[in-house]
């Protein structure tokens, strides 16, 4: 397969997603520290909880479940969406509650905000930031001719497989590469909002606020999977934005009561 030029607009989308994935969490960290008076520790607690609950524990459960019932889950979009939403809500919101109940001290609004920035921020860096770096590096190598030279040194099958994998960089619509950054922006906003809801549930001993945090997380993740099967990425992001907006409004209401 001949390598084609990766459009400049696609590379711009990759750069946009990269900047959002790293600059947004850092910006929120600075804002929470300087403007809200939050401590730095909750940010890193949020990062650590995401890594333990999602990267380690949730991923381990996924491996077991897919070994036992992988065909059943992947064979039904609805079942897969419900499963994914339940798992994400269960692990992330439970981790958020435990961390904010026992680790984040003092448990106040600024530190809840900081925790959310860390939890959502490290997710953005790992899921979108790292992928964007890889995409940009590959795109630059393709456009400069370096990648073609490297593929020439491989055996025919491996070179063809690598080229086929890289083809997404020039066949994917340029606008789609911006979607990763938009998705991460919304996700970070959601995590901050959910952290405020969980904070309020602890402060007010409100099961309703905690349940709402679980519910928002479940709904957003499930809808994203369901809509991805039938709609464009931008329709998915629009729906995610609307649900995230609901979480923001609920978190704002919680702040007004503090």
Language model features: what each stretch is:
Residues 1-258:
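Hydrophobic alpha-helical segments at protein termini of multi-pass membrane proteins
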């Amino acid at each position: 397969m001949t390598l084609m030029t990766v459009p400049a607009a696609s590379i711009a989308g990759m750069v946009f997603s990269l900047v959002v994935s790293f600059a947004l969490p850092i910006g929120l960290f600075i804002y929470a520290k300087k403007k809200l008076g939050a401590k730095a520790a909750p940010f890193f607690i949020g990062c650590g909880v995401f890594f333990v609950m999602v990267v380690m524990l949730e991923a381990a459960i996924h491996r077991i479940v897919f070994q036992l019932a992988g065909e059943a889950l992947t064979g039904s979009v609805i079942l897969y969406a419900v499963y994914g939403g339940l798992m994400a809500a269960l692990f992330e919101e439970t981790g958020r509650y435990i961390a904010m109940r026992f680790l984040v001290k003092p448990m106040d609004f600024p530190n809840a905000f900081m925790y959310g920035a860390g939890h959502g921020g490290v997710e953005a860096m790992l899921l979108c930031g790292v992928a964007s770096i890889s995409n940009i590096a590959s795109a630059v190598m393709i456009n400069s001719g370096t990648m073609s030279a490297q593929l020439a040194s491989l055996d025919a099958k491996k070179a063809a497989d690598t080229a086929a994998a890289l083809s997404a960089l020039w066949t994917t619509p340029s606008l789609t590469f911006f979607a990763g950054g938009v998705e991460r922006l919304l996700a970070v906003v959601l995590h901050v909002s959910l952290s405020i809801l969980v904070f309020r549930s602890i402060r007010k001993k409100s099961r309703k606020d905690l349940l709402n945090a679980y519910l928002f997380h479940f709904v957003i993740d499930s809808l994203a999977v369901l809509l991805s099967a039938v709609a464009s990425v931008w329709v998915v992001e629009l729906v995610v934005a609307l649900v995230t907006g609901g979480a923001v409004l609920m978190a704002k209401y919680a702040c007004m009561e503090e």
